[in-house]
Amino acid sequence: MKQTVLKNNLQNLLESAENILLLQGPVGDFFLRLADWLTANGKTVHKFNFNAGDDYFYPPTQAHTVVFNDNYDAFPEFLQEYITQHHIQAVVCFGDTRPYHVIAKRIANENQASFWAFEEGYFRPYYITLEKDGVNAFSPLPRRADFFLEQFPKLAQQEYKAPTPVHGGFTPMAKNAIRYYIELFRNPRKYPDYIHHRAPNAGHYLKPWSLSILKRLNYYIEDIQIAKRVEAGKYGKFFIVPLQVFNDSQVRIHCDFPSVRSFLLHVLSSFAEHAPADTNIIIKHHPMDRGFIDYWRDIKRFIKEHPELKGRVIYVHDVPLPVFLRHGLGMVTINSTSGLSGLIHNMPVKVLGRAYYDIPGITDQNTLAEFWNHPTPPDKELFHAYRMYHLNVTQINGNFYSQVFFPNKKTSNSSTPVI
C-alpha cells in the first residue's frame, strides 16, 4: 500500500478552496503577491482593506477588493453576509490575535469556511509559517510525541536540507512598516473607526526606531567583546534568557505574566534562589525592542537587592543568539521561537508560557527550580521528527518583507520566487 505523503499547507490551501478571502497581511505587499499566485492557479481572490496602509500595499482597484470603513461592531455581520454572498471557502490572515481576525475565525468556523493564519517563521531564518485554524499556542497540532513520530514516515523530506537564503533582518521590515504607518495616518478620515492592533500613533514608532539605530551603534563594540568572551569561556557555565517584544501577542495572549518585565524578575528570583552558585545568567534583549524599552535599571536594582548575583548577570543586545546556544547550559523563555533555535543546538529549554513546541520529550517538563540544577535536553529522534514535520507542512521558504518561494501550479516540489 502506497504511503500518503503530507503536503505543505500552502498547497493544502490551494487545493481546498476556490473562493478565498484575504484579510490583513504583514506590512508590505506579500498579500498582493499571494493573491497573484492564487489567481494564477485558478482561484478567485477577495480582499478586505481596513486602513490606508492596507490600501497602499493592496490597491482597492484590485479585483474583488472591499474597503471596510464601518465601525468594529458592524464587522461580524458584514463578514457573515460577504462569506455567504460570495461563497467564500477559506479566510486567510496574518496573525490570529488581531481584533478583526479573532472575529473572522469565529465567523469562518460558523460558516464551514476554513481559517488560515500566516505568521513569522517558527524555524528562522528563511521561513514563514502558515497553519490552519491558528498559529503559535493556538496551533491545533497535538502536543504529543507520538503524533510527530507517527507522521514522520509520511514526510516527503525526512532529512534536513538548508533552505534557500533570502534577504531579511530589521531593514526590509522597517522600510515596509514606515511606509505602512505613514499611509495609515496620512488619510485617517477614510477609515475613521478603524481599530489597530498596536499603538495608533505614528510618532510612537518613528522615534523608537531612530533610537534603535543609535543604540545598535552604541552597543556594537561591547557586543563584539561579549561574543568573544563567550566563545573563550570567560562566562563559565551560563543559562541564556532571550527576552521577547514587550507588546507581542505571544506575551499578551499566550502567557500568564503581565509583562516581559515580570517574567524577567521571576526568572532572576528563581535563579538567585535555586541555581548553583557557579552558574551565570545572560539576559538577551530583543532586537525589535531596542528603541522601545530597556531593562537594565530593573536588572541593576535586582542585583542590588541580591548581592550574591553581582558579576553573574550579563545583559546583552545584538550578540547573535547562536553564540550562546553553542556554549550555554540551557534556555528559559516565555514561548519565543528562540526556544526552537536552542533545541536545534540540543540545548535544554524551559518554557514558562504556552508554546506550540512545549511537548514532553522536547522541552524540559520539570519546575524552573529543578531546571537550574538538572536541565533536560530534547530527545533527538523526537525533535528531528517534530522539526521535519513543520519544515514539510507549516513552513514556507522565504521572508514576508523581501522574497517568498511559492510552489508552481503543476508541482509542489518546484518553486517560483516572488519578490
Swiss-Prot record:
Instruction: Extract the CDD domains matched here.
Output: beta_Kdo_transferase_KpsS
Its membrane topology is listed as: Peripheral membrane protein
Q: Which cysteines are joined by disulfide bonds?
A: none
State if Cell inner membrane is listed as a keyword.
yes
Q: Which UniProt keywords apply?
A: Cell inner membrane, Cell membrane, Membrane, Polysaccharide transport, Sugar transport, Transport
BP terms from Gene Ontology: polysaccharide biosynthetic process; polysaccharide transport
What Gene Ontology terms describe where this protein resides (cellular component)?
Answer: plasma membrane
Location comes to:
Cell inner membrane
Chief location bin: membrane
What's one Pfam family the UniProt record gives for this protein? Capsule_synth
InterPro entries referenced in this protein's UniProt entry, alphabetically? Capsule_polysaccharide_synth
Its biological function? Involved in the phospholipid modification of the capsular polysaccharide, a strong requirement for its translocation to the cell surface.
What's the name of the protein? Capsule polysaccharide modification protein LipB
> What species was this sequence derived from?
Neisseria meningitidis serogroup B (strain ATCC BAA-335 / MC58)
- Lineage, uppermost ranks: Bacteria, Pseudomonadati, Pseudomonadota, Betaproteobacteria, Neisseriales
